[in-house]
Amino acid sequence: MSRISVENVKHVAHLARLAITDQEAEKFQKQLDAIVTFAEQLNELDTTDVKPTTHVLTMKNVMREDVPEKGLPVEEVLKNAPDHKDNQIRVPAVLE
């Protein structure tokens, strides 16, 4: 017996504002039913010795510590800018 009906598929499609044909609804019903069946098979696994996890891989901070460093001299920065004035880089206006 199917756990997900064609009517369920049509209802969810309607909620998601998706227009699907009857043939598509039947196709999706079979696919979703197969997914639910597979998920139910996972419930049969013996996981008594498996520790609960929140991540598959161990989490570690890959970011470096935020340490201030001496920047480039203003002249060095401005020589790469297409336009500058009063030691500031000029850019085209973004807002009117």
From Swiss-Prot:
A Gene Ontology biological process term: glutaminyl-tRNAGln biosynthesis via transamidation
GO molecular function: asparaginyl-tRNA synthase (glutamine-hydrolyzing) activity; ATP binding; glutaminyl-tRNA synthase (glutamine-hydrolyzing) activity
Pfam families: GatC
EC id: 6.3.5.-
Keyword Protein biosynthesis: yes
Catalytic activity of the protein: L-glutamyl-tRNA(Gln) + L-glutamine + ATP + H2O = L-glutaminyl-tRNA(Gln) + L-glutamate + ADP + phosphate + H(+); L-aspartyl-tRNA(Asn) + L-glutamine + ATP + H2O = L-asparaginyl-tRNA(Asn) + L-glutamate + ADP + phosphate + 2 H(+)
Enzyme class: ligase
Record's keyword annotation contains Lipoprotein: no
Signal peptide, first to last residue: none
Keywords from the UniProt entry: ATP-binding, Ligase, Nucleotide-binding, Protein biosynthesis
NCBIfam families xref list: gatC
Functional note: Allows the formation of correctly charged Asn-tRNA(Asn) or Gln-tRNA(Gln) through the transamidation of misacylated Asp-tRNA(Asn) or Glu-tRNA(Gln) in organisms which lack either or both of asparaginyl-tRNA or glutaminyl-tRNA synthetases. The reaction takes place in the presence of glutamine and ATP through an activated phospho-Asp-tRNA(Asn) or phospho-Glu-tRNA(Gln).
Family: Belongs to the GatC family.
Subunit structure: Heterotrimer of A, B and C subunits.
Protein name per UniProt: Aspartyl/glutamyl-tRNA(Asn/Gln) amidotransferase subunit C
Species per Swiss-Prot/TrEMBL record: Bacillus cereus (strain ATCC 14579 / DSM 31 / CCUG 7414 / JCM 2152 / NBRC 15305 / NCIMB 9373 / NCTC 2599 / NRRL B-3711)
Encoding gene (name): gatC
